[in-house]
């Protein structure tokens, strides 16, 4: 069973019921909805299709709402686009105008106050570069360094600048409330800069009684510098290499990726490696060798999940991309020395009961050659505690709550399983083993290690280990 989870962005190439079914059967664990594109009505219809198919297939596929975040974009151009030449003057303005090859409007009104002469401005993921020469009223007068085609709503990056724009825009707030209403399991907070940004998102969720898990997207230098504090208040991070590769020098992206994975693993948090993992498969049925190696290296480093963006949203081969990603992941996972990895993680064991029990569960399972670790959990916390130590055997996350099973589907190595409610803890444990057997995860004669928090239902308390032989 594959341990690393796969996230697929849903778009025109994958939003039909037929394609969603194929993606889920190919191995998609989480469906990502990019709220930079599409109306609420369009997103609602996509969500309903995902929900319909996951119920039909009885698979705990989770949904992730990816916010726009505090981004800066160009506004519209006459004819939809314009050509910029190296060396020419180009003006960015906060005035409401239709763009031309000489000037264009930007979405962030106060950009002129956050930058100065000499600042570098990048457009369209860095394909177009310009330098600020002067600021005159509402106009930012720039010299084009690298020219090219600019078009409607292309992204604008200002590497290294500390922007004063609020973190949650009115549109983002509406999107978050929409996500709460629809029942998304995860929320990706784009361009997270500091822990206060995540706490602001958390307060909206708490205010509306939502248990959505928050994934902080690290995409700029502020986020990188504040990574530790962001991790401490979020449920995980996404290594968003697209905008990160524009905001920081390209050669530093691999270094930052490794640091982010290492820090997230140490804190027992989700870490999603994203962007261009199988970029060539947007047009080709086979990936490059470099892409295969990129995926494998992220898995060797300990990433929780790997993500497809354009490959699954708009590519010619979305299902093949998922199958390819799954095969590469399984191959890398077969090569990992889990005992050695656990010994490295042992330094992260804390003195509290939960982490001590979680680590002991993993070492017991490894020493006994257990077929599986079975966690009986209401919220998914116990499974999360076990997952952080990345044992070699499968972790079966048994819960009576379908929503918890979907949230567990992003946990490394965890196979979620919904079981029926029982009157006693003992009956629940027996039912968990029986359901694991029925699902084919274990068989008669297997040794399994059961762990849970007793009494059940108190989140954040894992305090029991039991070793049993499956009857």
Give each language-model segment a name:
Residues 1-471:
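Non-catalytic helical/linker scaffolds that mediate oligomerization, partner binding
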């Amino acid at each position: 069973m594959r341990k690393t989870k796969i996230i697929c962005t849903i778009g025109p190439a994958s939003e039909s019921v037929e394609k969603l079914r194929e993606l889920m059967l190919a191995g998609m664990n989480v469906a990502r909805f990019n709220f930079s594109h599409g109306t609420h009505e369009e997103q609602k219809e996509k969500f309903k299709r995902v929900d319909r198919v996951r119920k039909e297939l009885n698979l705990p596929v989770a949904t992730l709402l990816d916010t726009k975040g505090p981004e800066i974009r160009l506004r519209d151009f006459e004819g939809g686009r314009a050509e910029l030449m190296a060396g020419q003057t180009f003006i960015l303005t906060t005035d409401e105008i239709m763009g031309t090859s000489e000037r264009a409007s930007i979405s962030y009104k106060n950009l002129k106050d956050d930058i100065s002469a000499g600042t570098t401005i990048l457009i369209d993921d860095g394909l177009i570069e310009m330098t600020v020469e002067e600021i005159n009223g509402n106009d930012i007068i720039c010299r084009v360094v690298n020219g090219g085609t600019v078009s409607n709503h292309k992204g604008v990056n200002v590497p290294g600048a500390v922007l004063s724009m609020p973190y949650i825009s009115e549109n983002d707030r509406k999107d978050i409330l929409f996500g709460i209403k629809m029942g998304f399991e995860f929320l990706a907070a784009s361009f997270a800069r500091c822990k206060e940004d995540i706490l602001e998102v958390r307060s909206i969720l708490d205010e509306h009684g939502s248990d959505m898990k928050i994934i902080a997207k690290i995409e700029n230098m502020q986020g990188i510098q504040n990574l530790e504090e962001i991790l401490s208040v979020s449920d995980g991070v996404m290594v968003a290499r697209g905008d990160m590769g524009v905001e920081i020098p390209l050669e530093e992206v691999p270094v930052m990726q490794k640091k982010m994975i290492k820090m997230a693993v140490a804190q027992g948090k989700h870490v999603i490696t994203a962007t261009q993992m199988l970029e060539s498969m947007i047009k080709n049925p086979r990936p490059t060798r470099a892409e295969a190696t990129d995926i494998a290296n992220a898995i060797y480093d300990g990433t929780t999940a790997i993500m497809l963006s354009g490959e699954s949203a708009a590519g010619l081969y979305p299902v093949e991309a998922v199958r390819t990603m799954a095969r590469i992941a399984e191959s890398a996972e077969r090569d990992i020395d889990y005992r050695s990895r656990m010994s490295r993680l042992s330094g992260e064991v804390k003195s509290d009961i939960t982490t001590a029990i979680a680590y002991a569960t993993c070492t017991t399972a490894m020493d006994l050659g257990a077929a599986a670790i079975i966690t009986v959990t209401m919220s998914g916390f116990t499974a999360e505690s076990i997952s952080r130590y990345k044992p070699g055997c499968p972790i079966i996350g048994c819960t009576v709550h379908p929503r918890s099973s979907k949230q567990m589907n992003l946990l490394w190595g965890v196979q979620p399983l919904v079981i029926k409610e029982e009157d006693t803890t003992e009956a629940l444990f027996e039912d968990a083993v029986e359901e694991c057997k029925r699902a084919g995860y274990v068989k008669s004669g297997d040794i399994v290690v059961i762990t849970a928090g007793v009494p059940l239902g108190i989140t954040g308390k894992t305090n029991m280990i039991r070793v049993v032989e499956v009857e």
